[in-house]
């Protein structure tokens, strides 16, 4: 007996978060907007999740990296390092 292939329905288009927020240009100093594109673990969310275009995803990723360098946003895994330093 042949197994039936699982068919998936049509995929739902993701809404572009930058357009819905009304942001025209991405700035590393706008941490409130950049936090939307960071997971709870501090990682940059993918295009599939955010619905951004390729160019917008590159701009957001670069802005997040710049904000991390300026200590405006945390690096991923930074909380674990802090907890380890606090607990002897």
UniProtKB/Swiss-Prot annotation:
This protein's UniProt keywords: Ribonucleoprotein, Ribosomal protein, RNA-binding, rRNA-binding
Example of a GO biological process term: translation
Transport recorded as keyword: no
GO cellular component terms given for this protein: cytosolic small ribosomal subunit; peptidoglycan-based cell wall; plasma membrane
InterPro entries from the UniProt entry: Ribosomal_bS18, Ribosomal_bS18_CS, Ribosomal_bS18_sf
Pfam family, any one: Ribosomal_S18
A single MF term (Gene Ontology): structural constituent of ribosome
Paired cysteines (S-S): none
UniProt xrefs under Gene3D superfamilies: Ribosomal protein S18
Subunit structure: Part of the 30S ribosomal subunit. Forms a tight heterodimer with protein bS6.
Function: Binds as a heterodimer with protein bS6 to the central domain of the 16S rRNA, where it helps stabilize the platform of the 30S subunit.
Name recorded for this polypeptide: Small ribosomal subunit protein bS18B
Gene assigned in the entry: rpsR2
């Amino acid at each position: 007996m042949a197994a039936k292939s699982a068919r998936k329905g049509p995929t739902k288009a993701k809404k572009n978060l930058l357009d819905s927020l009304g942001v025209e240009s991405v700035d590393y100093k706008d941490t409130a907007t950049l936090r939307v594109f960071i997971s709870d673990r501090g990682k940059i969310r993918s295009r599939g999740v955010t619905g951004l275009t390729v160019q917008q995803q590159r701009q957001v990723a670069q802005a997040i990296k710049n904000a991390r360098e300026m200590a405006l946003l945390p690096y991923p895994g930074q909380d674990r390092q802090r907890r380890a330093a606090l607990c002897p």
